[in-house]
């Protein structure tokens, strides 16, 4: 019985050290390397058709913070956390038709603005 307690103690100590190391890194440290700023980049897939097609790509900011009590009272479904985010979107674009029937937006300027992931 004493053997199993020592074994369990070693496993718990190892797990504790691993979790401490894991939580000491900022979020996303393992998955992302410096995210580039929001700017125009060539879309390689559509540019193969002969005309260079540009697309806005890159990172903006996002943050989350506790919802103020005053705001929670007015919510239909109260939430403890409020989040904000901006996405890299086109400020200006030119409509382009490729191969007679493919209509695309060729971005000409980019900036960080409100995210509309649901927008088609």
From Swiss-Prot:
- Residues annotated as glycosylated are 80, 106
Q: Which GO terms describe its molecular function?
A: follicle-stimulating hormone activity
Q: A biological process (GO) annotation for this entry?
A: thyroid hormone generation
InterPro entries the record matches: Cystine-knot_cytokine, Glyco_hormone
Q: Which UniProt keywords apply?
A: Disulfide bond, Glycoprotein, Hormone, Secreted, Signal
Query: For this UniProt entry, what is the primary localization, expressed as one broad class?
Result: secreted
* Presence of the UniProt keyword Iron in the record: no
N-terminal signal peptide:
1-24
- Quaternary structure note: Heterodimer. The active hormones thyrotropin, lutropin and follitropin are heterodimers composed of CGA, a common alpha chain described here and a unique beta chain which confers their biological specificity to the hormones: TSHB for thyrotropin, LHB for lutropin and FSHB for follitropin.
Family per record: Belongs to the glycoprotein hormones subunit alpha family.
This chain's function reads:
Shared alpha chain of the active heterodimeric glycoprotein hormones thyrotropin/thyroid stimulating hormone/TSH, lutropin/luteinizing hormone/LH and follitropin/follicle stimulating hormone/FSH. These hormones bind specific receptors on target cells that in turn activate downstream signaling pathways.
> What is the official name of this protein in its record?
Glycoprotein hormones alpha chain
Native source species: Equus quagga burchellii
Traced from the root, the source organism's taxonomic lineage reads:
Eukaryota, Metazoa, Chordata, Craniata, Vertebrata
Source gene?
CGA
């Amino acid at each position: 019985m004493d053997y199993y307690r020592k074994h369990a103690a070693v496993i718990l100590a190892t797990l504790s050290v691993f979790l401490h190391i894991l939580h000491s890194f900022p979020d996303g440290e393992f998955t992302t390397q410096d995210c580039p700023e929001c700017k125009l980049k060539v879309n390689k897939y559509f540019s193969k058709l002969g005309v260079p097609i540009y697309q806005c790509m890159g990172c903006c900011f996002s943050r989350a913070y506790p919802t103020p009590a005053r705001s929670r009272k007015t919510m239909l479904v109260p939430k403890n956390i409020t989040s904000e985010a901006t996405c890299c979107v086109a400020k200006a674009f030119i409509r382009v038709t490729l191969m007679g029937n493919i209509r695309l937006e060729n971005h000409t300027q980019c900036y960080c603005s409100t995210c509309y992931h649901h927008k088609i």
